[in-house]
C-alpha cells in the first residue's frame, strides 16, 4: 500500500517547470543518452578485448563530434524546438553514428582489422533506427487519434522502454548474432530512412500549422449577443400579475 501511496503523489511537469528545466523536458536529450547507453552496454557485453574496446572509444568520440557538428543549429535554439526539429535531430544523430562507424572501418582501421566490430556496431545502429522509426510512427498515430498529447513525455517513456529492453535482451540472450552477418549497409536503406524521417517531420509540421491556424481563427470569432427591443419586466411586476390573476 505504501508503494501505491507514493505513486499517487507523482505529478507531471507543468509548462513553467519545463521552461525552468529545459534539459530535462526536451526529449532529444533522453534520445541521445538512452541511445548511446544502449550502444555502449551492448558493445561492452559482447566485446571485452582491449583492441576491441579501443574501437568503441574511437567510435564514441567520432560519432559524438559529428553529431554535435550536424546538430549545432538545433542545440543553439533548443528552447524553440518543435516535434519536427526533434525528429530531424534524431535522424542526424543516427547518421552521425553510422558514418563514424564507416569512417573508422575504411579509413582509420585499414585492411579490415575490425570487421567484426564494424558489423556489430552497424547492425546495432540499424536495430535502434528501426525501433525509433516505429516509436515515431506510433506517437504520430496516437497524437492524431487524440491518445497522446505530450510528445516529449511519451517519447521519454519509450526511451526508457528501449533501454530496459536492450539490457534485458543483452543479459538473457546476448547479442552474438549481430556480429556474424551485416544486415544492410546499402545507400538505398539510408535513403529510405532519410525519406521516412523527413515525411514524419513534415507531418508534425503540418499538424502544428493546422492547429495554430484553427486556434487563431477561433480566437478571432466574436459571439454577438441577442438584442431585444423590449427589456424583460422586473420580477415584482411578474409577481403582482400572478396575484391579480389568482384573485
From Swiss-Prot:
Where, subcellularly, is it found? Answer: Host cytoplasm; Host nucleus
GO cellular component entries? host cell cytoplasm; host cell nucleus
**Main localisation:** host cell
Q: Which domain of life is it from?
A: Viruses
Disulfide bond keyword on record: no
Keyword tags: Host cytoplasm, Host nucleus
Q: What does this protein do?
A: Accelerates mortality in insect larvae.
By what name is this protein known? Protein AC124
Q: Which organism is it from?
A: Autographa californica nuclear polyhedrosis virus
